[in-house]
C-alpha cells in the first residue's frame, strides 16, 4: 500500500462520520503504510474554479498573482496524487451530490495534458495504477437508487483522469434514528475491515 493520500471533505469537523470511518481505515493499516498525506479540504479549502483560475491552469507567461498561486497549488495537489499508491476519499452526500470542497479539488487537478489528454479516440486518463477507496456517508438510504447521483459522478470523474480501480463503502441511514445510524456505521466498518484484511 505504501503511500496513501487521504481526502476529507466533511463540513462537520469532529462530528463527521465519514472522517471517523476514514481514520478507522487508515489506522487499521498500521505499519503497512509508508506515508500518509491527509488533506482536509474544508480546513484548507481549494479556491472555487472561475474564469481567471481556469485560464491560469493552462499556464503561460503573463499570469496574474492569483493565477500563479492557483497553478502552483494545482501542481502540488497533482504531485500528491501522482506519488500516492492508494487514494482514500471521504465523500459525504450533501443534497444528492459531493461536497463543494471535494468538487473544487477535482476542478483544480483535472488538467489537459497533465492528468488527462485528448486523443482522436476520446479523452485518456493519465493517473493510472492506483487504488481508490471512497467512503460515502448519507443521512438516508440511497445506494443503487435513482437519488444516488454522486457515485456515478465520482466514477466518471475518477475514470476520466485514469483512476478506474475504485471501491465504494457506504455508511447509510445516519439520520434515521439511533438504531439505524448505528447499523449503518457498523456495516461500513465491516466493509472497511474486509478491505484492510
Swiss-Prot record:
One of its GO terms (molecular function) is FMN binding. Its cofactor is FMN. Its EC number is 1.6.5.-, 1.7.1.17. InterPro entries: Flavodoxin_fold, Flavoprotein-like_sf, FMN-dep_NADH:Q_OxRdtase_AzoR1, NADH:quinone_OxRdtase_FMN_depd. Disulfide bonds: none annotated. Keywords: Flavoprotein, FMN, NAD, Oxidoreductase. FMN binds at residues 10, 16-18, 93-96, 137-140. It comes from the Bacteria. PANTHER family: FMN-DEPENDENT NADH-AZOREDUCTASE 1, FMN-DEPENDENT NADH:QUINONE OXIDOREDUCTASE. Belongs to the azoreductase type 1 family. Homodimer. Quinone reductase that provides resistance to thiol-specific stress caused by electrophilic quinones. Also exhibits azoreductase activity. Catalyzes the reductive cleavage of the azo bond in aromatic azo compounds to the corresponding amines. This is FMN-dependent NADH:quinone oxidoreductase 1. The gene is azoR1.
Amino acid at each position: 500500500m505504501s503511500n496513501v493520500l487521504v481526502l476529507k471533505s466533511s463540513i462537520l469537523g469532529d462530528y463527521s462520520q465519514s472522517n471517523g470511518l476514514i481514520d478507522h481505515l487508515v489506522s487499521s493499516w498500521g505499519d503497512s503504510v509508508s506515508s500518509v498525506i491527509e488533506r482536509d479540504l474544508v480546513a484548507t479549502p481549494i479556491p472555487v474554479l472561475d474564469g481567471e483560475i481556469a485560464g491560469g491552469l493552462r499556464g503561460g507567461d503573463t499570469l496574474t498573482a492569483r493565477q500563479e498561486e492557483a497553478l502552483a497549488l494545482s501542481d502540488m495537489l497533482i504531485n500528491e496524487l501522482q506519488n500516492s499508491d492508494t487514494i482514500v476519499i471521504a465523500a459525504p452526500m450533501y443534497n444528492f451530490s459531493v461536497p463543494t470542497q471535494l468538487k473544487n479539488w477535482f476542478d483544480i487537478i483535472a488538467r489537459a495534458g497533465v492528468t488527462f489528454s485528448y486523443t482522436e479516440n476520446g479523452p485518456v486518463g493519465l493517473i493510472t495504477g492506483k487504488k481508490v477507496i471512497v467512503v460515502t456517508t448519507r443521512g438516508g438510504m440511497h445506494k443503487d437508487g435513482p437519488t444516488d447521483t454522486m457515485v456515478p459522478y465520482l466514477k466518471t470523474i475518477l475514470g476520466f483522469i485514469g483512476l478506474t480501480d475504485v471501491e465504494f463503502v457506504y455508511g447509510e441511514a445516519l439520520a434515521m434514528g439511533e438504531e439505524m445510524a448505528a447499523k449503518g456505521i457498523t456495516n461500513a466498518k465491516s466493509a472497511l475491515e474486509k478491505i484492510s484484511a
